[in-house]
Structure formats: C-alpha cells, structure tokens
Amino acid sequence: MLLPIPDVLSPAQLSQLRAQLDVADWADGRITAGHQSAQAKDNAQLPEDSAVAREAGALVLEALARSSTFFSAVLPRRIYPPLFNRYSGGQSFGYHVDNAVRYDRSRGGAEAVRTDVSATLFLSDPDSYDGGELVIEDTYGTQSVKLPAGHLVIYPGTSLHRVMPVTRGARVACFFWAQSMLRDAAQRRLLFELDVSIRRLTQDTPGHPSLIQLTGVYHNLLRQWADV
C-alpha cells in the first residue's frame, strides 16, 4: 500500500527541523547503503550518531506518535531511528530495494528491525528544487511522488524504487523504516481500510450497534494476525 499522509509536521516543527539541518555537517550517503545499493547511491546524509540527527529524529518520532493515520496504516511494532538525506547538484539514487533487516544500535546492542514499511518525510518545498521525485514500482505500476514539505509517504519495503536527479536547489528529506505488527502487506491494507470505514461510520451514524460488531471484527483479526 502506497499512502501519502499530509501534514505530519506542523509549520513550527518543520521550521525547527530545517533550522537544525541547515547548519548540520553532512557526510557521504553511502555509509548506510548495502553493497548493491551503494553502487547506485549518490547523496549526502547526516551521520546516525550525530547530535543533530538524534534531536531531529526525536522530533519526527514525536510527530509520528500523534498521527492516527500513520499508526492505523503501519501498525508499527518497531521504528528504525529516522535518518536524513540531501540531494543537490545532479545527485540521485538509482533503482534499489531496501535491506530486509536493519540493526538499531541507538540504545546499545543491535536490535533487528524488519523493514516491512519504508517511509519518506519531505522537508523541502517542492518549488525549491527540480527533480528529486521518489519513483516507486508497485502493484499498480510506476508511481512518482513529490510532496509538500511536512508530508509523508509510506510504501512496502519490498518495493523497487529510486530518487530522480536533483538538477536545481536541494531536496532534503527524512527517511526511516518500520517493522509492523503485521508482516503481510495485504493484511495491513485490509485492516487499514476497515479502520477507516469504522471511523467514517462513527461520524455518520454515531451509536449504531453495528459499530461495536465491526470494531470487534477489527480487533479479532488483529489478534489473529499480529506478531507482538
């Protein structure tokens, strides 16, 4: 399921993030790439252990925690600490599939995170740069994504995708992965659609007795499928 989620960041949060990132020290983005994807990757990235990356990542996680749409669509069990990249001067990232497992060393040790869901949070105004579209190959064909600053897109971690060359300005974004309680993308889509329908029915016909039954169906399916 490819899903844009608008306004994950407020204007104040976006301004704070950009102020931090504008003065940050960027490094070669290939530091987090696997062997194959490193050959296709050309961008700049904040080192994961930098103070700016940790502070900015914490802000993003706080924003995600307030997004009911993100939670409903992803049903996250673990979220890999958010990372930040920048493309400019013709930089791009060729077609690749994200590593199946990432190792979170932010708390000491190395906690495995299965990358069920990939996410990109756009931090640059789309009018401030040319190119930089996130191109995703999914079940319904090729999707090109270039969203307003503060908007998020999520898509299955199994997807073949690329970032087109940025020929003017700079494209700054946050990216991360989530391990869902539901490994299967079709199950995630089904529960998301059911949750959205329940919410709409609650608004349109509050107190309808069928809502209790539908909510029970949702939770019983989650109980049957969830890996927690």
From Swiss-Prot:
<feature type="binding site">
    <location>
        <position position="161"/>
    </location>
    <ligand>
        <name>Fe cation</name>
    </ligand>
</feature>
<dbReference type="InterPro" id="IPR023550">
    <property type="entry name" value="PKHD_hydroxylase"/>
</dbReference>
<dbReference type="InterPro" id="IPR005123">
    <property type="entry name" value="Oxoglu/Fe-dep_dioxygenase_dom"/>
</dbReference>
<dbReference type="GO" id="GO:0005506">
    <property type="term" value="F:iron ion binding"/>
</dbReference>
<dbReference type="GO" id="GO:0006879">
    <property type="term" value="P:intracellular iron ion homeostasis"/>
</dbReference>
<keyword id="KW-0560">Oxidoreductase</keyword>
<dbReference type="Pfam" id="PF13640">
    <property type="entry name" value="2OG-FeII_Oxy_3"/>
</dbReference>
<dbReference type="InterPro" id="IPR006620">
    <property type="entry name" value="Pro_4_hyd_alph"/>
</dbReference>
<dbReference type="GO" id="GO:0006974">
    <property type="term" value="P:DNA damage response"/>
</dbReference>
<feature type="binding site">
    <location>
        <position position="96"/>
    </location>
    <ligand>
        <name>Fe cation</name>
    </ligand>
</feature>
<keyword id="KW-0408">Iron</keyword>
<dbReference type="GO" id="GO:0016706">
    <property type="term" value="F:2-oxoglutarate-dependent dioxygenase activity"/>
</dbReference>
<feature type="binding site">
    <location>
        <position position="98"/>
    </location>
    <ligand>
        <name>Fe cation</name>
    </ligand>
</feature>
<keyword id="KW-0223">Dioxygenase</keyword>
<dbReference type="GO" id="GO:0031418">
    <property type="term" value="F:L-ascorbic acid binding"/>
</dbReference>
<keyword id="KW-0847">Vitamin C</keyword>
<dbReference type="InterPro" id="IPR044862">
    <property type="entry name" value="Pro_4_hyd_alph_FE2OG_OXY"/>
</dbReference>
<protein>
    <recommendedName>
        <fullName>PKHD-type hydroxylase XAC2942</fullName>
        <ecNumber>1.14.11.-</ecNumber>
    </recommendedName>
</protein>
<feature type="domain" description="Fe2OG dioxygenase">
    <location>
        <begin position="78"/>
        <end position="180"/>
    </location>
</feature>
<keyword id="KW-0479">Metal-binding</keyword>
<dbReference type="Pfam" id="PF18331">
    <property type="entry name" value="PKHD_C"/>
</dbReference>
<dbReference type="InterPro" id="IPR041097">
    <property type="entry name" value="PKHD_C"/>
</dbReference>
<feature type="binding site">
    <location>
        <position position="171"/>
    </location>
    <ligand>
        <name>2-oxoglutarate</name>
    </ligand>
</feature>
